[in-house]
């Protein structure tokens, strides 16, 4: 095993021992979030780690029975101070079972950030940090301790809470003073007095992220990114992302809590029953589908001044109002990746272009004997990921006008248009029935024109009746051989096999959503012993690392 992996295992083993010993601390001290009053009330972003949940699900006592952790913890490379700390975590002076929270705060465009944790005994924490970190033991001044780590990074604490604070050189105040002010701020100026945070913290999660949209809007100003964010996040209200390690899945749930009852841009039900008939030319490696409420989407776009101006520019360019443009579309959209292959043989248009380039190359060489130019050395094959973007349409009135008059794509046949992508392959747009597909596969485009549908279907266990659905395969055996061969070629066989070994417990990713809530789930193979997904991921990773 190389040195880096050994260090990683020692650190991992140390964390597991601390986790096991922390169960004792858990019994000794009650749960509290009082230390989080250090976070400013109008922090832009707050991330909370529920340490107790993670310790319970990781099952550190069980992990420590694994040979890899027993070997790492008992190899004798541990300092006396760290060993003492692992034997008795309370010696640190900090309560490692309480929630840890990070925050980003913005005022007048200037950002500061910090990591907040619970302190039980400031004096013992000062002693432990000075021994473990090699710092000069700080003196207590006005009830506070401070250690400067870098010019704008410092560790500040009292007998109740601590913060690893990252200041900003644009603030005309020392880093220490900025950190000390957080420790002295009363609760009414802290995140604990923020009603949005209270609603966020009341939820059950292992790791949670909260974004206050009101503060983001006020501090970030107006730009293109904010326009897009506001379309889905709303300039008022707040958003959160909650991560939970369940038994057979890792759940990542995001919700936009919009103020004033703002509508979702998703419909209440899934796409038209026929929409997924043109999902992909083969069963997809991954896909995502959306059923959009175009009226709600347009209303939210027009609610933002900058986006409204952009829409007006589009209306002027197209010579018609947005309502007339959108009348041609039904709001159903899907994007699928189906393969990685050479697309030249299936594409007569591309084949003709490549043959012309080949002749030009030969003529060039015949004039300059022995001279070769990459400019004219057109490849014999073009291997690309094959994608299909399917947009549901009610008619071809506006789409046809846009393709012919504005984008000026070349018409190949009725309903089929092409354009060069600039990357060798062509891009095709085909319209038939309720489908308008955009793809780099001539075969897929021509199949839609001939039959009105494509062969690829979503996996049987995917619920496509909701307004948001998706699935992405993670198991190599479920992927086309051409795709895995490409990964081996790009990564190298050794790195590819290591990736497969590390990812062995993972099966696929599913996506679903309704209203203002979306759910991404990473699915693991079922466990015979019923253990939690976090334990299994940690145990598997440790065992694989031990084989290097």
Residues of each region from the PLM?
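Short, Lys/Arg-rich N-terminal segment immediately upstream of the first membrane anchor
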Residues: 1-5
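Structural boundary/hinge residues at secondary-structure and domain interfaces
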Residues: 6-7, 11, 18-149, 187-234, ...
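Short, structured motif recognition centered on aromatic/hydrophobic residues
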Residues: 46-47, 112-117, 162-165, 384-391, ...
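Solvent-exposed coil/turn segments that connect beta secondary-structure elements
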Residues: 52, 119-122, 160, 169-170, ...
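Short loop/beta submotifs within extracellular cysteine-rich repeat domains
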Residues: 55, 122-126, 172-174, 396-398, ...
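An internal, short helix-loop-strand segment that often contains or flanks glycine-aspartate motifs
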Residues: 65, 69-99, 132-247, 274, ...
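Long compositionally biased, domain-poor regions of proteins
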Residues: 324, 329-433, 439-440, 445-446
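C-terminal regions of mature proteins
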Residues: 505-539, 543-547
């Amino acid at each position: 095993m190389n040195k880096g992996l050994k260090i990683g295992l020692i650190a991992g083993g140390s964390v597991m021992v601390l986790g096991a010993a922390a169960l004792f601390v858990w019994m000794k001290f009650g749960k509290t979030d009082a230390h989080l009053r250090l976070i400013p009330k109008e922090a832009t972003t707050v991330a909370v780690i529920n340490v107790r949940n993670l310790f319970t699900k990781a099952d550190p006592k069980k992990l420590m029975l694994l040979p890899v952790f027993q070997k790492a913890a008992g190899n004798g490379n541990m300092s006396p101070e760290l060993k003492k700390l692992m034997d008795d975590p309370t010696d640190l002076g900090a309560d490692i079972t309480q929630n840890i929270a990070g925050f980003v705060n913005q005022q007048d465009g200037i950002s500061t950030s910090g990591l907040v944790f619970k302190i039980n005994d400031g004096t013992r924490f000062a002693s432990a940090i000075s021994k473990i970190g090699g710092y000069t033991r700080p003196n207590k001044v006005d009830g506070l301790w401070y250690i400067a780590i870098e010019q704008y990074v410092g560790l500040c604490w009292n007998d109740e809470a601590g913060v690893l604070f990252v200041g900003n050189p644009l603030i005309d105040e020392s880093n220490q003073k900025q950190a000390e002010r957080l420790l002295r701020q009363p609760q009414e100026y802290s995140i604990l007095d923020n009603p949005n945070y209270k609603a966020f913290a009341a939820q059950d999660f292992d790791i949670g992220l909260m974004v206050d949209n009101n503060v983001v809007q006020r501090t970030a100003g107006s730009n293109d990114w904010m326009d897009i964010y506001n379309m889905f996040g709303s300039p008022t209200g707040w958003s959160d992302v909650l991560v939970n390690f369940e038994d057979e899945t890792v759940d990542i749930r995001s919700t936009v809590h919009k103020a004033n009852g703002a509508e979702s841009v998703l419909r209440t039900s899934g796409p038209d029953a026929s929409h997924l008939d043109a999902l992909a030319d083969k069963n997809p490696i991954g896909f995502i589908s959306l059923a959009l409420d175009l009226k709600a989407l347009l209303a939210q776009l027009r609610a933002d001044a900058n986006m409204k101006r952009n829409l007006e520019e589009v209306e002027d360019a197209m010579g018609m109002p947005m309502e007339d443009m959108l009348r041609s579309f039904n709001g159903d959209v899907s994007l699928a990746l189906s393969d990685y292959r050479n697309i030249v043989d299936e594409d007569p248009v591309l084949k003709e272009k490549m043959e012309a380039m080949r002749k030009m190359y030969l003529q060039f060489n015949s004039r300059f004997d022995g001279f070769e130019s990459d400019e004219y050395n057109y490849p014999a094959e073009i291997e690309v990921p094959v994608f299909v973007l399917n947009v549901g349409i009610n008619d071809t009135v506006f789409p046809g006008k846009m393709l012919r008059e504005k984008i000026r794509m070349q018409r190949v046949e009725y309903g089929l248009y092409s354009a060069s992508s600039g990357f060798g392959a062509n891009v095709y747009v085909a319209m038939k029935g309720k489908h308008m597909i955009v793809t780099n596969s001539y075969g897929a485009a021509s199949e839609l024109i001939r039959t009105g549908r494509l062969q690829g279907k979503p996996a049987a266990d995917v619920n496509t009746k909701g307004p948001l659905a998706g699935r992405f395969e993670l198991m190599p055996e479920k992927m086309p051989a051409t795709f895995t061969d490409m990964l081996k070629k790009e990564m190298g066989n050794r790195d590819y096999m290591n990736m497969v070994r590390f990812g062995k417990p993972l099966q696929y990713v599913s996506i679903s959503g309704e209203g203002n809530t979306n759910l991404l789930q990473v699915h693991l193979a079922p466990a015979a012993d019923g253990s939690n997904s976090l334990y299994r991921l940690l145990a598997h990773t440790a065992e694989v690392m031990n084989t290097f």
